[in-house]
């Protein structure tokens, strides 16, 4: 399965009538493996900041999580595995796999729990596959 198919079929899938507003799979080096058409252009320092938070959990909390220049307030995640952010009625879930970052961005009416489920389910699968 291509990385784009993982984004299209698994991250941008429908859950209880809702969809993520944007999603991507990004390599640890910052290269985009696949993304939805609506995913923002990430800056290298944004990817570095995310990876640093996985290595040193809590490092993004004071400054916020930035994606394409949009700031998200960091909320409780799973140290070293999942970073969650909130901005108004929407937010973001970032799951780290062995080789990549899976990023899902949502807005209402999708709930944070639905976003977490979609992103983390695929992330867990990729980890199991050694990816």
From Swiss-Prot:
The UniProt record lists the keyword Cell inner membrane: no
Swiss-Prot/TrEMBL keywords: Actin-binding, Allergen, Cytoplasm, Cytoskeleton
Function: Binds to actin and affects the structure of the cytoskeleton. At high concentrations, profilin prevents the polymerization of actin, whereas it enhances it at low concentrations. By binding to PIP2, it inhibits the formation of IP3 and DG.
Gene Ontology molecular function: any one: actin binding
Quaternary structure (record): Occurs in many kinds of cells as a complex with monomeric actin in a 1:1 ratio.
Protein name as annotated: Profilin
Keyword Cytoplasm: yes
Gene Ontology CC, one term: cytoplasm
PANTHER family: PROFILIN (PTHR11604), PROFILIN-2 (PTHR11604:SF49)
Predominant location: cytoplasm
InterPro entries (UniProt xref): PFN, PFN_euk, PFN_sf, Profilin_CS
Domain of life according to the entry: Eukaryota
Family named by the database record: Belongs to the profilin family.
Cell location: Cytoplasm, Cytoskeleton
Native species: Prunus persica
